[in-house]
Every structure is written in structure tokens, then in C-alpha cells.
């Protein structure tokens, strides 16, 4: 798709009747949005076809003019998709570029298309349609990522690994349980996407500049034709509203934060020091100087894109925060933020799904690490509560002394002699050793939502029925 970016001071704008001279070259440059809003060409044409069809149905334009308009718009769609359309900066935006070309193709009938319509409701329509499609893509990509995690969780429902708090070993869990935590996160993201689709499912076309129109239009007809549930209810709010864009960016930002947390774990876990996973060659790169390197660049780039997405959200919030009703030109700056965030989110979700499916899980390294850091200390305290009748706070104190002794001796809890344990508390018996293995610890966590393999499988089954 070619673009004419020449500076000009000629006045051939479609709003130029009130002006005696054309805009300055720098005004054209700052005012033009065609460099980015040409991305909305398909939505703009789709909306114009629906609008023209409604105008003819209502007797506002003739059927003959409607047919010319629809034919011309379809020709323009083909030209753009074939890369044969020249976009002009002096025509400002996608709406006026298409309308100008339509006038070239069909003559005066093109001038009837904008009857009962403003660029204010036109751009609101185009942008809503585009965001709706992007939300549907995000829903599909999140579903794919959830499916990848469900498969890994099922495969590793019994694979023991260390669970962490403060990035310090806390308690043994299973890798399947850890995977299911991300299923919950991304499941919430997907639910937010679905709610956002419901929220924006109202057609803005017909609100005109801000006050509605005196023509006998049928907004319900265009809403139905464009796949919306209903038209918006207040014309001032309709052209002022960018909540749908802010909601998209909010969802993208939350999803990106989840992706970033996951990416951080992938980066850490793939280091030789952890060695919990091995990334496939397909999602790694090498070094230009160090032949041995295998870098987790895909995960790092996913982590970095979170900054871009969060920045887009803050940018649009700041753009919108002081705008009086209804439309202001500031709102032209909304699209680049959403376009960039949508592209970043799509890349990040697809890359992460590939990494999760392709990575090798090193169960032996996970299990070896699971017992480090006295990870079964809580099991020892729970045993003292159950078997010796100690209040939990007393059991916590006794266990702390046992941990200190093991640390002093440089051994695991299970390696301490019984006499050393009994010297700390006489109620301790040899039965204590039965709860000090990581396998026993994991198996005991049978509470709803816990890490015991059977509980993990219940979680997987629940999600299988909803994915």
C-alpha cells in the first residue's frame, strides 16, 4: 500500500469550505493519522457499506446510489488488499482517503455516503470493530496457552519440585500444580476478554458528531448488520467513549504481567544453576562470541514487551484524563497505543505457548531441589500438632530449633538422629521420619486446590471441561 507523504498547502480537504487557505505543511503533518489508521481500512469499508445500505432502506438515498457506493467500496477494498491503493497524507485519515477514492470511482454519488454520519461516530465504529476482532484473537490465543499448560500439568501431576516464596524454598509441590496456577491466571485473563467483548458490543454509528441526526435513520438495522447486540444509547457518550480501548489495554497489561512472571521463571529455571527445564532450539538464540551459549531470548522478549504494553495503557489513560465531552482531536492518539499493544500481546502469547509445549522438563533436577532448604519443615510442625498435641505456635518453635540443628550439622531434616530430635522435644518418635520425605509431603496436601496429585488431576479435569 503506497503512501503519498508530500507536504502541501493546497486546500482540498473535504471540510475546506469554511477556509480561505490551506493548512501549513507542519499542520498537515501533525494532523494526519493515515500513517497508522490505514490499519482500519476493512472496518471502515464494512461500516460504510452497512451505513449506505441503511440509508437506502430508509429512503434517504436512492437504491441506485447505494449500489454504486457498495460497488465502489468493494473495489477500494480489493485495491487496498492488492497493494494498489495510494494513501495521501493531505487527506488526513482512512475515512477521507477512502471517500476521495470513492468519488474518483463513482462520481457525485460518493458525496451521499456521509449523510447522517460524522467522522466522530465513524472512527468510533471502526475502532470498536477492530478492538472486538483483537479481543477475539486474544481469547483464542489464551485458550491455546491454557491447553498447553493443561497438557504439561497432566504429564507432570506427580513430578515433585520445590515451591517458592520470596524465591526461597518453601514447601514441596508438583510441577503439575505449578502449571495449574498459570491456568488459573490465564483463565482469568480470558474471562476478562469475554467480558470486554460484551461491554463493547454496541454500535456507535448514527450518533453523528455528538447530538444524533435529524434524518430518519435506523440504528438498530446498522447495529445488526455489523454484528453488534444493539446501538449505543447516548450519542454524546458514544463519540466521547474510549473505555473499550482502555479496557483492552488493561486486559493486555494484566495478561502481560502474568506472561512476564512466567517468563522470569523460565529464564531462571533454564539456567545451569537451576536446570529445571531445557528450552528447545526453536525458542532460543546463541551468542556471537561465546559458542557455548543458549540464551532464553524468547522469554526475555516476552518479559520486555510487558513494559511496552503497560506503557500503552498509561499513555491512553493520560490522553483521556482531562478531555471535556464530547470529541477532541487528542483522541486521535488512541490508536497507536492499542495497535502496538495488540501486536505485542499476540506475539507474546503465541511465543509463550510454543515455549511451554516444546520445553523439556527435567524432573530429576526438580526432585533433587525439592528436598533442599528444609522444605518439609512444615510437615514436621504439623506432625507435632497431630501426634504430640502441641499448639501450632509451639510446634513452629520446636521445628525452628530442629532446622537450626540440621543447618549446623549440614544435613537434611531426615538425616538427623532420633536422639538429637528427642533432645529438642521428648514427644518426637521414630514415626516423624515418615513425613519428612518430599513425596510424603506432597501426597499429604489433599485439601481442595492442594498439590497432592489427585487434587491436581481434579483441577485439570475441571478446566478440561471449560477450555
Curated annotation (Swiss-Prot):
GO cellular component terms attached to this protein's record: cytosol
Keywords: Amino-acid biosynthesis, Arginine biosynthesis, Cytoplasm, Lyase
Matches recorded under CDD domains: Argininosuccinate_lyase (cd01359)
Pfam families, per database record: ASL_C2, Lyase_1
GO molecular function, one term: argininosuccinate lyase activity
Location in the cell: Cytoplasm
Organism superkingdom: Bacteria
PROSITE patterns to which the protein is assigned, alphabetical: FUMARATE_LYASES
GO BP terms, alphabetized: arginine biosynthetic process via ornithine; L-arginine biosynthetic process
EC number: 4.3.2.1
Catalysis: reaction(s): 2-(N(omega)-L-arginino)succinate = fumarate + L-arginine
Thylakoid in keyword set: no
Keyword Cytoplasm (UniProt): yes
Primary enzyme class: lyase
InterPro entries: Arg_succ_lyase_C, Argininosuccinate_lyase, Fumarase/histidase_N, Fumarate_lyase_CS, Fumarate_lyase_fam, Fumarate_lyase_N, L-Aspartase-like
Pathway given in the UniProt record: Amino-acid biosynthesis; L-arginine biosynthesis; L-arginine from L-ornithine and carbamoyl phosphate: step 3/3
Protein family: Belongs to the lyase 1 family. Argininosuccinate lyase subfamily.
Listed name of the protein: Argininosuccinate lyase
Organism: Allorhizobium ampelinum (strain ATCC BAA-846 / DSM 112012 / S4) (Agrobacterium vitis (strain S4))
